[in-house]
């Protein structure tokens, strides 16, 4: 096979890429123009379709004796651009491309591609699927469970899908990972009990235990398959009513899961008849099917042309998107039995009626009433159709079926369109009203030849200022909503059209093609083509002007019905049942938008059910405060904290106001758009803007007091400790660094020991519900660890001694200190006097009244895969926990809105009652509900003093 290699340079301006992919069926020999070396591109390589900007399409115009070629960028050699003959490639859809690209051996990749049933079943393999894994060739397969599905490195236009499998039974210990890939934890399992493999090494275990084994085919199996009875691009006919219609075969094969029914044929009709989109049962069988003119029928309903006819220029028609090239399917084709017969047999197949609704005759117009959008001259938005004279012969269509079962925001998801033709009273074929995406702009289809490449788009918008990228609406009942992806004027039409990508699938729509020409690319059944003058700005939003970016969209569009209140009155947090009723549900908490989860979750933790920092909201402005101090404080108090406590909801618009203020700080940037760390946010807000008196005052080894707003635990991992508590971690850190609190804090924010967002020092951390900081305070009376009397000395070297209150800070009275350090192992210990308050009442400690300084846990901030969520305690009961996610759900697509949600998670209380030993032995994957995230993903734990929270 020969092909032209244009260069080994990076593909930039000369081409633009589309998300269409092809598999090479023949080996390529190409020359690198830089090195003049011959490069081999093996069969089984995958290329991405590219288009030449200068000519508007990727095919090299055919000359006499030469066939069409298409341009490809080989994914394995991303700088190589080459042209290949159409016959030497086959198109595959993106989902199959992802599965195949993970297989590095091109021969094995091609073999799996030809085994299309196995490949189709690969789409069913997901997290939780039971599988068998072939680790080494010729050896037995090991059972396992899929724990991860996705790309390992997302660095290409499309990335290969790998499967992370936890090996079970005899496979345990035979793997090579614990779920970590290049330092990133993709799933969790025991050491050497996990593997990352591609689909060719997997076998899905199904209910009947057959799995994919019967479908597995090696390269040698594929040559024994019967070829289909009809060749691609061959001409055929079929009876439609009383007339005969002709077309070209673009698909001929058995249907996945329906092999016993025999062959089915996809025909691209010469006239606009049919409504097959190339899919069957969710599997794309043919990528060149057009809902405007393609039909799928059983082979019994097809009549091959017996006489030579002049054909249309052949389309790029292959067994594509999961279907192999002719004769290369690896499962057995059906024999000529009762289920199949010679093409042209006139016994209508049962599945013909199943796939196409009914027979294509006059009865169809009775059983399948089409619906179309009528033209209303008074409202230009209604003028979506221009009926040809043929339409006058058809009786008016009835009203569309009732759609009351759909919610108002979902009614436009699907419409009962029909794309067939009905016989006219005079015997000719008259158009029935077609879908909005076809008939509203079709005109006389036969007067215009098939357009191979899109015309240049028209850059200017309409009178409403609509342009490419605008949120638009096509006013109908119900209306269509979407984003304009293309504006232009196709050949043969006098009107300027707009190509919209709809929010949801709609029957009769395409994937970006119109009349056989691709104008943009989107998901199937989401591309709608209408006259530009019929479009209006999306009426669901307050602003009619398009916005330039996500930052301004948050404000100018007002987020529809997602605005929140402004509350001037100072409001303490509502606790227990009252707080629960206010806060739980969807559209509760703080709405996330554009990488704001770090800020949403931190604010929710600090203020939803705690008043520990309320003084921050009340301090009057002083002369040294910055100019926007009052603006920030007022925003926090009246638009965020108070509404959150009264109504349980704050919209993203208010948070964006705060993010813009954070951007004003000279040392800060990216707060309106980038992902940030909570500690960075707290430092900017508390230190630079609000000038909050530092929450913590810490002294190191008698040195000057250091001020800070939160404390991060730094320590080396102790392999002897399975699940540490926050109490242990804080004490270890203070002892090892020789630190003390100079004052008892009213609010203590502790950052967990971890490096960055990904690496955790401990797999689980137990969030102590109560924190005793008495032994960590300066000038505070403390109990002797032995007798309970007033401690006079502290010994850091005794801390690790397992014989004396293991894992506790050691302080002793004078007598006990002498006794303890008489032991030979402790003779050389260096202990120091405990600092005590000068005015300590003598009778207090003599009567055992040494007070304890304790703090209560009120919130935990967690992170998993760069997304922050929050756990908050709303009452005294152990089960009084709520889980908050600012981006729990979504309304709409790319230009939609996040929906925050707060849910009760009482199961947390049960896990916090468990012993540390039981918690350590518990498999993290078996932890129910949200509790796993609390125990495994803690980022910050927040404590408050029950007696001081309103005074500091």
UniProtKB/Swiss-Prot annotation:
GO biological process entries: CD4-positive or CD8-positive, alpha-beta T cell lineage commitment; homeostasis of number of cells; innate immune response; necroptotic process; negative regulation of canonical NF-kappaB signal transduction; negative regulation of canonical Wnt signaling pathway; negative regulation of inflammatory response; negative regulation of interleukin-18-mediated signaling pathway
Chief location category: cytoplasm
Region annotation Disordered: where it falls in the sequence: 311-350, 386-409
Gene name for this UniProt entry: Cyld
Ranges of compositional bias, category Polar residues: 327-346
Region named Interaction with IKBKG/NEMO: 466-680
Region of interest called Interaction with TRAF2, as start-end residue ranges on this chain: 390-465
Binding site for Zn(2+) 2: 795, 798, 821, 829
Pfam families linked to this entry: CAP_GLY (PF01302), CYLD_phos_site (PF16607), UCH (PF00443)
Positions bearing Phosphoserine: 383, 414, 418
PTM: Phosphorylated on several serine residues by IKKA and/or IKKB in response to immune stimuli. Phosphorylation requires IKBKG. Phosphorylation abolishes TRAF2 deubiquitination, interferes with the activation of Jun kinases, and strongly reduces CD40-dependent gene activation by NF-kappa-B.
GO molecular function, one term: K48-linked deubiquitinase activity
Name listed for the protein in its UniProt record: Ubiquitin carboxyl-terminal hydrolase CYLD
Binding residues for Zn(2+) 1: 784, 787, 813, 816
Regulation: induction: Up-regulated by TNFRSF11A.
């Amino acid at each position: 096979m020969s092909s032209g290699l244009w260069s080994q340079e990076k593909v930039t301006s000369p081409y633009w890429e589309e998300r269409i992919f092809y598999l090479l069926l023949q080996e390529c020999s190409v020359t690198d123009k830089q090195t003049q070396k011959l490069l081999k591109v093996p069969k089984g390589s995958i290329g991405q379709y590219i288009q030449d900007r200068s000519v508007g399409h990727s095919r090299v115009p055919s000359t006499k004796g030469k066939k069409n070629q298409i341009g490809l960028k080989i994914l394995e050699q991303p700088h190589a651009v080459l042209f290949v003959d159409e016959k030497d490639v086959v198109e595959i859809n993106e989902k199959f491309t992802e599965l195949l690209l993970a297989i590095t051996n091109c021969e094995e990749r091609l073999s799996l591609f030809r085994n299309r049933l196995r490949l189709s079943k690969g789409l069913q393999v997901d997290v939780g699927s039971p599988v068998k894994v072939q680790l080494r060739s010729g050896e037995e397969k090991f059972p396992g469970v899929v724990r991860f599905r996705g790309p390992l490195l997302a660095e290409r236009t499309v990335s290969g899908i790998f499967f992370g499998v936890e090996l079970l039974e005899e496979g345990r210990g035979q793997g090579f990972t614990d779920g970590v890939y290049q330092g990133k934890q993709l799933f969790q399992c025991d050491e050497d009990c996990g593997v990352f493999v591609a689909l060719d090494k997997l076998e899905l275990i199904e209910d009947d235990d057959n799995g994919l084994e019967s479908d597995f085919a090696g390269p040698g199996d594929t040559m024994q398959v019967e070829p289909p009875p009809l060749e691609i691009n061959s001409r055929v006919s079929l009876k439609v009513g009383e007339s005969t219609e002709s077309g070209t075969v673009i698909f001929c094969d058995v249907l996945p899961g329906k092999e016993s029914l025999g062959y089915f044929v996809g025909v691209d009709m010469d006239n606009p008849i049919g409504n097959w989109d190339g899919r069957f049962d969710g599997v794309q069988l043919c990528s060149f099917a057009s809902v405007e003119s393609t039909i799928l029928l059983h082979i019994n309903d097809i009549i091959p042309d017996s006489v030579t006819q002049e054909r249309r220029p052949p389309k790029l028609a292959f067994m594509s998107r999961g279907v192999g090239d002719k004769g290369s399917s690896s499962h057995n084709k059906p024999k000529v039995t009762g289920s199949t017969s010679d093409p042209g047999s006139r016994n209508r197949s049962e599945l013909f009626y199943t796939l196409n609704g009914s027979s294509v005759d006059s009865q169809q117009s009775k059983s399948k009433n089409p619906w179309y959008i009528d033209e209303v001259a008074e409202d230009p938005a209604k003028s979506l159709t221009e009926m040809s004279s043929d339409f006058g012969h058809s009786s008016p269509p009835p009203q569309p079926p009732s759609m009351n079962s759909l919610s108002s925001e979902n009614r436009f998801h699907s419409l009962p369109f029909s794309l067939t033709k009905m016989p006219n009273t005079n015997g000719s074929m008259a158009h029935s009203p077609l879908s909005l995406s076809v008939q509203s702009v079709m005109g006389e289809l036969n007067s215009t030849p098939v357009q191979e490449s899109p015309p240049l788009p028209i850059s200017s918008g309409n009178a409403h200022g609509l342009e490419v990228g605008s949120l638009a609406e096509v006013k109908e009942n119900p209306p269509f909503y979407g984003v304009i992806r293309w504006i232009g004027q196709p050949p043969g039409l006098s009107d300027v059209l707009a190509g919209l990508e709809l929010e949801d699938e709609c029957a009769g729509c395409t994937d970006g093609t119109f009349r056989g020409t691709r104008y943009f690319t989107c998901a199937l059944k989401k591309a709608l083509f209408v006259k530009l003058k019929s479009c209006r700005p999306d009426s669901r939003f307050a602003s009619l002007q398009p916005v330039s970016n996500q930052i301004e969209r948050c404000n100018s569009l007002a987020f529809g019905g997602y605005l929140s209140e402004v509350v001037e009155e100072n409001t303490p947090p509502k606790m227990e049942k009252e707080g629960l009723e206010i806060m739980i549900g969807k559209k509760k908490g703080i709405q996330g938008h554009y990488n704001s989860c770090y800020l949403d979750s931190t604010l929710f933790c600090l203020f939803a059910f705690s008043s520990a920092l309320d003084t921050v909201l009340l301090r009057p402005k002083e002369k040294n405060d910055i100019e926007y101090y009052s603006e920030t404080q007022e925003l926090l108090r009246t638009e965020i904290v108070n509404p959150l406590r009264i109504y349980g909801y704050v919209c993203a618009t208010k948070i964006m106001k705060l993010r813009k203020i954070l951007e004003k700080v000279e040392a800060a940037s990216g707060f309106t758009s980038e992902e940030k760390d909570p500690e960075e946010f707290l430092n900017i807000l508390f230190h630079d803007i609000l000038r909050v008196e530092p929450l913590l005052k810490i002294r190191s080894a008698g040195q000057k007091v250091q001020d800070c707003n939160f404390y991060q635990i730094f320590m080396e991992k102790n392999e002897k400790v399975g699940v540490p508590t926050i109490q242990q971690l804080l004490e270890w850190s203070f002892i090892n660094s020789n630190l003390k609190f100079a004052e008892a804090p009213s609010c203590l924010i502790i950052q967990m020991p971890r490096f960055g967002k990904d690496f955790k020092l401990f797999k689980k951390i137990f969030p102590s519900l109560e924190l005793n900081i008495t032994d960590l305070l300066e000038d505070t009376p403390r109990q002797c660890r032995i007798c309970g009397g007033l401690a006079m000395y502290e010994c850091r070297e005794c801390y690790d001694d397992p014989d004396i209150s293991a894992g506790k800070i050691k302080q002793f009275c004078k007598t006990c200190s002498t006794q303890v350090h008489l032991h030979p192992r402790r003779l050389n210990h260096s202990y120091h006097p405990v600092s005590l308050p000068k005015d300590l009442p003598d009778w207090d400690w003599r009567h055992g009244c040494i007070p304890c300084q304790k703090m209560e846990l009120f919130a935990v901030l967690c992170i998993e895969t760069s997304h922050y969520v929050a756990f908050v305690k709303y009452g005294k009961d152990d089960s009084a926990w709520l889980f908050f996610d600012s981006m729990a759900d979504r309304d709409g697509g790319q230009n939609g809105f996040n929906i925050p949600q707060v849910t009760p998670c009482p199961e947390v209380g049960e896990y916090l009652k468990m012993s540390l030993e039981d918690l350590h032995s518990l498999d993290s994957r078996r932890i129910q509900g949200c509790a796993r995230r609390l125990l495994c993903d803690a980022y910050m734990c927040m404590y408050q003093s029950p007696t001081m929270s309103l005074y500091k």
